[in-house]
Amino acid sequence: QGAVDWRKVKAAGIEFAVIRAGFGMYENQTDPRFAENMAGAKEAGIPVGIYWYSYAASADEARREAEICRKVIEPWREQIALPVFFDQEYEPAIKAQTRTVRTEMCRVFMQSIQEAGFRAGLYCSLDWYLNWLDRSRLAEWPVWIAHYAKKCGYAGENLIAWQYSARGRVDGVSGDVDLDEGYEGLLPARRNGWGQSGKGWYWYENDRPVKNVWRKTDGWWYRLGPDGRMLTGLQEVDGRGYCLNPARGTVGGVYVPEGACIITDENGAIL
């Protein structure tokens, strides 16, 4: 589809996008426009999810695909608001496997993604989900179904998105584009207050981490660092040393590292 003008996409009323990160088991199979698309969507303020197109023909290969996917998307972790989808389709090597093996490949990929701290889901056609996979072993996972009809042919509780057309047109994108409808659970509620990610605790305001400021909650002061992460231990802030509780990141008590003697003022600054 070439370069995407994400500002035009946003102006066209698009509320979310799922961007291809890559395919297969090797890092050189990263989508060449992945970083460009992620940056453009971020600048335009469009929430994004990820999909990884699979060629895996065994659980081990699916695990390898998940590992590569995780590596590729990690730098964009804070931007990824929607699930990371495993895209399993009608590749000959996949069709040649049993239903049990195909289902296990889905589970292995999604479990690996979830273990890395991302939300995980499955993308496939309605026919694939109903006839090529064991749905009873996938009911716990969100599913995004492609079914080009007036109404989605699947209405299970785990349905979070329906792709209803492959021939849509959106200003800012050249040629045909897939069109989707999102349901409850696709977009997370906007975060306000404390939230935890793989690196630590963050304070969110309107879904964005606050950076380089003090925040007071429940009677305690917390310092948020340059990446928004709550700071702990001995820290220098604006030229002054602070002793922040190693467990809570708070100022207000005296934390003395083992073997040290530290005196602080009433604000927690080291004297």
Where are these predicted regions, by residue range?
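Functionally critical loop-and-helix segments that line ligand-binding/catalytic clefts
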Residues: 1-8, 136-191
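Substrate-binding cleft of extracellular glycoside hydrolase catalytic domains
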Residues: 1-110, 114-116
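A mature extracytoplasmic/lumenal domain signature
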Residues: 23, 52-54, 90, 126, ...
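Hydrophobic anchor at the start of a short beta-strand
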Residues: 48, 119-121, 143
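Glycine-rich, charge-decorated loop segments at or immediately adjacent to ligand/cofactor-binding or catalytic sites
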Residues: 61-64, 128-136
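Structural recognition of alpha->loop->beta junctions
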Residues: 70-86, 90-92, 133-158
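Aromatic-lined carbohydrate-recognition surfaces of secreted/lumenal glycan-active proteins
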Residues: 113-131
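Extracellular adhesion/carbohydrate-binding repeat motifs centered on closely spaced tryptophans
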Residues: 189-271
